[in-house]
Design a protein with these regions (language model features):
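Alpha-crystallin/small heat shock protein
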Residues: 1-103
Length: 103
C-alpha cells in the first residue's frame, strides 16, 4: 500500500522507518504515538487548478505501525521526499532481565 517504506535496523535498540512521500512537505504530515501505535497521516493541500491532464496523485494517506513496548519516537526529519523516523527502545532498569549469580 501507499506510501512505500523501508525499516532499517541501526543497532540493537534503534530503528529507522523511511517513507517515500514525494510532493509532501513536513507541514502536510502529522505523526502521533499513542498506546504503542504510531500513526502517520498526510494530506496535500489542494490548489484549485484546472488540469488538462492530471497524472500526479494528490491523495491523502494514513499509515500505522505497532511499536514494541518501551519504544519511543526519537526524531523525525523530511528531506528530498523521504520522511525518516528514528525509533529507540529504552527499557527501564527495573524491567530488564536480572542475572542471578550461582554460588
Amino acid at each position: 500500500g501507499y506510501p512505500h517504506y523501508n525499516i532499517k535496523k541501526l543497532d540493537d535498540n534503534k530503528w529507522s522507518i523511511e517513507l517515500a512521500l514525494a510532493g509532501f512537505s513536513k507541514d502536510d504530515i502529522e505523526i502521533e504515538v499513542k498506546d504503542n501505535i504510531m500513526n502517520i497521516n498526510g494530506e496535500l493541500k489542494t490548489e484549485d487548478n484546472e488540469y488538462v491532464y492530471k497524472g500526479i496523485s494528490s491523495r491523502k494517506f494514513s499509515k500505522s505501525f505497532t511499536l514494541a513496548e518501551f519504544t519511543e519516537c526519537e526524531s523525525a526529519t523530511m528531506e528530498n521526499g523521504i520522511l525518516s523516523i528514528i525509533l529507540e527502545k529504552n527499557i527501564p532498569e527495573d524491567k530488564k532481565p536480572q542475572k542471578v549469580k550461582i554460588k
